[in-house]
Amino acid sequence: MTLHGLGIGWRPEISGIIAQLNKPTFCEVIAESIGDSVPPQLAALGVPVITHGISLSLGGAEPVQQSRIDHMARTATLLGSPLASEHIAFVRAGGLEAGHLLPVPRTYESIDALVRNITRTRDGLPVPFAVENIAALFDWPDDELTEGEFLAEIIERTGVLLVLDIANVYANALNRRLDPWTELNRLPLDRIAYCHIAGGSIHDGMYHDTHTDPIPEPVLELLTRFTAGGRRPAIMLERDGNYPPALELLDELDAIADAAGLDRITADTVWSRP
């Protein structure tokens, strides 16, 4: 299945708003939040639902735990997902949990470990698999490759797809004092499954991809430039806390749609503007 149009990350806290949207073309759900049944509000949407992991730790030196792969596979089957995805990151090492996504050293040794873990995960899933670029608040001193080279090598060796997080491209470029457009074009854009976009903010001189703030205008401008050449990837909004009033969330969805040249999905809700 080829994804298209505008979607949103499904979260229980905003499920009532999502239920009134004018047919988002897809949703994404956090795999670890799903148990043995589909939440009724999610099932009622009647749209494709992507299974998205946050705890596989693909970039760890240890093999991905089989129980976590099995849970992702069961969730993808339960949801009828067309696709499953996870981050190029590690979240644990030596049995210790970091509690958040950490960047992987961009080295050939790390690529070998990632390829093993991604291949193991891919082979254990009933659906295609995609990996996502993360926002990194630091780089490792022994990095050997650019982010574009790193991602391209991983994807070429595993054959998986890319979840292109446009906000993370912006975050990394800003924090590394690089040009976001140049960095975006260094990624393996021919392997995109779908795109993420989210908000963030500056703290202590660093841009943080918070998912709890509005999308900054430069991120929307990067999206506009990316889609201006005729690209029409599926795009979804991530929001993971500090949920705004319904009208603000609808306005943000409209801003994404307008920036990417996509159809709006906010008409006819009880909160919609006249």
Description of each model-found segment:
Residues 18-22, 35-51, 64-82, 121-124, ...:
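Acidic (Asp/Glu)-rich catalytic clusters
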Residues 125-206:
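Acidic/histidine-rich catalytic cores of soluble enzymes
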Residues 243-273:
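C-terminal helical cap(s) of enzyme catalytic domains, especially alpha/beta-barrels
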Residues 13-17, 29-41, 57-67, 137-145, ...:
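Acidic-and-aromatic substrate-binding clefts and catalytic sites of carbohydrate-active enzymes
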Residues 68-162:
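Active-site acidic/histidine proton-transfer and metal-coordination neighborhood
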Residues 1-20:
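Boundary/entry segment of secreted carbohydrate-active catalytic domains
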Residues 4-10, 25-29, 49-52, 84-86, ...:
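Hydrophobic faces of well-ordered beta-strands that scaffold small-molecule active sites
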Residues 63, 101-105, 111, 173-232:
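Gly/Pro-rich active-site loop or hairpin
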